[in-house]
Structure formats: C-alpha cells, structure tokens
A protein has these predicted regions:
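FAD-site-proximal beta/loop scaffold in flavoenzymes
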Residues: 161-177, 262-353
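Glycine-rich dinucleotide-binding loop and its adjacent helix/turn
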Residues: 51, 148-203, 236, 284-305
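N-terminal Rossmann-like dinucleotide/flavin-binding domain of flavoprotein oxidoreductases
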Residues: 2-7, 46-137, 141, 217-244, ...
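Core beta-strand elements of the Rossmann-like FAD/NAD(P) dinucleotide-binding domain
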Residues: 7-9, 134-143, 258-267, 307
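Rossmann-like dinucleotide-binding cores of NAD(P)H-dependent redox enzymes
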Residues: 92-99, 172-173, 178-182, 188-249, ...
C-alpha cells in the first residue's frame, strides 16, 4: 500500500500511554517537535485496564475491611458491598473508556497525535496504518522512543483458545461478578485481583505454581498476604499447576490440575506474567528481533544493532521494572536525554545524574493493594547479600510496637523490615506489610534513593501517634540488636 502522506518531527513516540506521555512532555519542554502514535486509547493500559481500574475495584474492599477492624465502626456495616456501585465508580475513573481528555492533553503540550498502528520502517522512520487504512510515514530527526508496553503472557495449555480466559483487561473492565473465579498466578496482579473479586462477592480460588505468594518479595510478604486472603475466604493453593482447561458451557470452565484433581469455576483469570508488545512494530527493519525485550542503557537508549543512537525504549518494553511509575521515570529521563543530545549539550549520566535511570537498579518502589497492604523499595535481604553487601536486618511486628498502628486498626497485624549495609550504615531496602502502609512507601523511597544512613534517620522524627512511627521502632530494633544478619 502506498504512502498517503509524509510528516517530519524531531521525536516520534510509539505509544501514548503514561510512559510515552512523559517522554513526549520532556522532549516538548526541550523545544522539540513531537509526534505520538497510538493504536488504542490514549492513556494506555494503566489508565483503562490496569492500575487505575484495579485500584478503583480494590478501594471499597479495603475500606470495608478497615472499618471491620475498628470497634464501633464495624457495627455500622450492615450489608454487603454494592458491586454495581463499585463498577460505576470504576467507570468514572476510566472515563467510560473515552480517551478524549487525554488526547486533549497531548495537543495541549503541543505534540501531534497520530492514531493507528505504527511500525518502524528503517532508521528514524515510522509508518502508521490509520483506521482508514491509509499509511502515513513519520520521520524523526533525532529519536524514536518505543513505549508500546507489554501484554499478558499466557501459557500454552490445551483448551486455552476455546476457553477464552480472563486476562488483566477482563478482570478490570468486567461489570459482572462470577460466582466462582479461579486466579492462576500469585504475583501482584493475582493477589490483588483475588482480593478485589472475593470482596465483590466471588468465591475465589488462587492457584500458585510456586511454594508461596509474591516470590520476589521478602518471604514474610507472601505469608501475611496469603493469611489475609484465607481469612477473607479465598481458597489459596500453592505448589499446583494447571495442565489443561475446557469450557463446559457458557458459564462453566473446568481446570485440570497437575495433582490429578479438577476445579470447576465460572471464569478463570490468568495472571502469569507479561511479554513485550514488540512483535509487530518493525524491529526487524532495524536489525532487532521482533517480540523481544529491548535492552537499554541508563539513558534508555537501545543497545545492540541500532547505530547512531536514535532508538530509545522506556517502560515495560525494556523489562527493567514492569511498573507504571518506574516507566514514567524512564520516559522523563529519556525525553530529557534526547533534548540534551539534540541541543548538543553534555549528558549527566553519572549515578543519580539528570540523564541516568539509576533508581532502576537501587530504588524501585512497589505497592500491593491487598488486605493487608504491602510496600517495598530497594533490595531485599537476600538481594543485598547476593550483591555482596555486609548486610544487617532489623524486623518489627508493627502492631506490637507502634501506637499509631494500634489506633488505626484494633488487632493490627503487620511487619516491617529494614535492610542496612553495615559498612556505610546506608539503608538498602525497606519492606512493610500491614493496613495503610502503602502511604508510607515514599518516605522509604526517599531514604533509599537519598543514601540516608541509620545515624541520620534518628534525626527524622516521626509524628506520634502515626503508623510512621515504625521508623523509630526499626531504628530501636537495629540499635538494640533485635535483628539478624
């Protein structure tokens, strides 16, 4: 098909989700002409089928759970959660899957939105097939930034195609509550969606192939969240895999498990990881493998066969940290680096420099909106040991020693861990589990990213009585030796 028109930009961004938006905004701030290509909704997966709608589903569930933990408040709960009300609230936060507001934002920063499927067509060139089947060629003077994100990675099991299981999209946009729901996978999506749908009225069975939940976190995170799920009524099964599945009828699915048993549910959600959305973006035209993750340096410049330093990748697609906030950080730095290079200015790529995604290596924050919540940043104790730090760990049971936590919830159950490099006294990582801890995460992130030492932390006085007083209790545990190496 012939090219209908040609357009020139300084920067072309493939993908107008939050990562692409941040890259575009920084490039525009540097005075560059930016074209953004989007084949679905402007705002991307996070805005419509992941972060935002999932938290809209979870918030009412957690709010009710919090109320039930407080004498005097629990008596006010006389009914069940209104799924209809929850779905209506979610729909408002995803603007009924209408992206006109975010499209207006793109034009508001002075960027140009081109709707359609974009593919690389050699160096610095992107060809977009629009909804009218026209082909528009975009040429980038300085850079192309790939921000196409990721898709669900589904296992190759008998019956998958016929069964049409849920992925994160159906789990976050459904307006019907299945009576019985199986969730396959015990990572972040799995435990959050098990929490949400159990709270909305499903009987949820959570299946984990491994020996526990959230295996990349400190071990106590999965233990406490698993206990919370069981207390909420979820059937949690570990060490079990799905061998095959089949749909009995429009409302029933049978899972064949590797222990020989069968599980019959109304719907099944597979939360079994992510794969890069790079299989159909023309990577082969620039010497890269279609469907691969794009390895980048700390400016988000793609390594490998690409010459002249024009191809960047930010967000899920580079496989550094599959988290929206971290991808936005990468997008900002990529956009700033492109702007500096275009102006002929030197780059500050030293650790923690203006053009270095140093936090990807040392200070990635993540939160799980389960019951109890979990939040972590930096290294786990094992990761710190593997990196050959001289590690010392301090642990506390939050509900035993923090008055603010006791006031927050009767019988508060939670745990916090601080990982310290003994040679420098520097904080390497923090993990917290308990009601309300996600709002404490940024203080931990500042401490880790800022190379704050234990000695200096003593001067950061937490307000009494707040859950933040766990910082003081961690310091006391570290000082008094109620910790371990």
């Amino acid at each position: 098909m012939a090219i209908a028109s040609e357009r020139d930009f300084d920067v072309v961004v493939l993908g107008a989700g939050p990562i692409g938006q941040n890259a575009a905004e920084r490039a525009r701030a540097a005075g560059l002409r930016v074209g953004m290509v989007e084949r679905e909704l402007v705002g991307g997966e996070c805005s419509y089928w992941a972060c935002v709608p999932s938290k809209a589903l979870l918030r009412p569930v957690i709010a009710v759970a919090d109320a039930r933990r407080i004498d005097g408040a629990r008596e006010a709960i006389t009914g069940t959660i209104s799924a209809e009300g929850v779905f209506g609230r979610r729909n408002r936060y995803v603007t009924d899957w209408d992206d006109s507001g975010q499209a207006d934002w793109v034009s508001g920063i002075g960027a140009t939105l081109v709707r359609g499927h974009g593919r690389l067509d050699g160096p610095r060139r992107v060809v977009v097939t629009t909804g009218d089947d026209e082909r528009v060629a975009l040429t980038a003077r300085h850079a192309v930034v790939v921000c196409t994100g990721s898709r669900p990675a589904l296992p190759d099991l008998p019956g998958m195609t016929e069964t049409k299981p849920w992925t994160n999209r159906r789990a976050t946009d459904s307006s019907e509550v299945p009576q019985r729901l199986a969730v396959v996978g015990a990572g972040g999506v799995g435990v959050e969606m098990a929490t949400a749908w159990q709270g909305l009225g499903s009987q949820v069975t959570l299946l984990s192939r491994g020996s526990g939940l959230l295996p990349r976190m400190e071990p106590f995170v999965g233990e406490l969240i698993g206990r919370g799920l069981i207390d909420a009524g979820v059937d949690v099964r570990v060490g079990v895999s799905v061998r095959a599945l089949r749909r009995l009828d429009d409302t029933s699915v049978v899972l064949e498990l590797d222990d020989g048993s069968e599980l019959t549910v109304n719907e099944v959600l597979f939360a079994t990881g992510r794969a890069p959305l790079t299989d159909d973006i023309g990577l082969e035209t620039v010497g890269l493998e279609p469907g691969s993750w794009l390895e980048v340096d700390d400016t988000c410049l793609v390594r490998g066969a690409v010459e002249d330093g024009w191809l960047y990748a930010a967000g899920d697609v580079n496989h550094r940290a599959l988290l929206t906030h971290q991808g936005k950080y990468q997008g900002r730095i990529a956009g700033a680096a492109i702007g500096a290079r275009a102006a002929g200015n030197p780059l500050d790529t030293n650790p923690w420099g203006a053009h270095a995604t140093t936090a990807d290596h040392y200070a990635v924050p993540q939160a799980f909106f389960t019951d109890p919540e979990a939040a972590a940043v930096g290294l786990t104790a094992q990761q710190a040991k593997d990196a050959r730090y001289h590690v010392r760990v301090a642990d506390i049971e939050i509900g035993d020693v923090v008055m603010g936590a006791k006031l927050y919830a009767d019988g508060y159950t939670g745990r916090a861990r601080m990982v310290v490099d003994q040679e420098s006294g520097r904080l390497l990582g923090v993990t917290m589990v308990g009601p309300g801890v996600t709002e404490l995460l940024h203080s931990a992130t500042i401490a880790v990213a800022g190379h704050v030492t234990v000695d200096r932390l003593w001067h950061a006085v937490p307000c009494f009585p707040t859950i933040s007083e766990l910082w003081l209790r961690l310091l006391e545990a570290y000082r008094d030796g109620s910790d371990h190496n």
